[in-house]
Amino acid sequence: PGVMMTRARQAIATVEQYRSRVDKANQRLAVAEMNRYAAVEDVLHLLQRQLLLQRAARDIDDQIIELGTDARQLRLQLSELRGTIDDDIEMLVCDYIVTDGVPHAELIDGALRDLENLPDSDLLTSAALARLLGLPATEENLVESVTPRGYRVLSRIPRVQKFLIDHIVEEFGDLDAIRAAEPEQLAVAEHVSPLWARHIAEGLRRLS
């Protein structure tokens, strides 16, 4: 158990490093999105780091189960470091996978499955990740600008559920159009009441 505990602690330290890199990449993309200069490489940079964190955290799960009650503190630490990484990856895919309009569930599920099955060696190449999202995969295309649909930003507003985000994205198309909309315009989207529209508009203002 002593050796296993040492290994588990070392693995947690690695996950901590990945979490730090995810947070930095996430902040970088968020700022780029809000200022309209997000590029393909920013998206792939974040996705790569998210997947590394997700895989590293899963690798520790079995060790923690084996250690049982001795690993209670490590279990809490891992849970905190993992955060909502699965949902975060899904929202990033929803924002940037290439398709017309709102990406349907089968497309998202397929992309998430493909990302899970991606060999570790491909995880470190931008081209492999780009292809799974339908983004341009060549070196010179990495600086191409991209606009998110708005899933990641809208999901950061308290109590805004994904089905509401789907309707808003369906109505407006992308984050720039959503941010430019007045509350009464947001309320045109299906299932978005005037009250919700004001809440969302206020949330977007706070995040800007």
How should these model regions be labeled?
Residues 2-42:
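Conserved phosphate-handling catalytic cores of large alpha/beta enzymes
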Residues 21-32, 47, 51-53, 65-189, ...:
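Long, highly charged, low-complexity intrinsically disordered interaction regions
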Residues 38-41, 45-58, 62:
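Long, charge-dense, solvent-exposed interaction surfaces that engage phosphate-rich ligands
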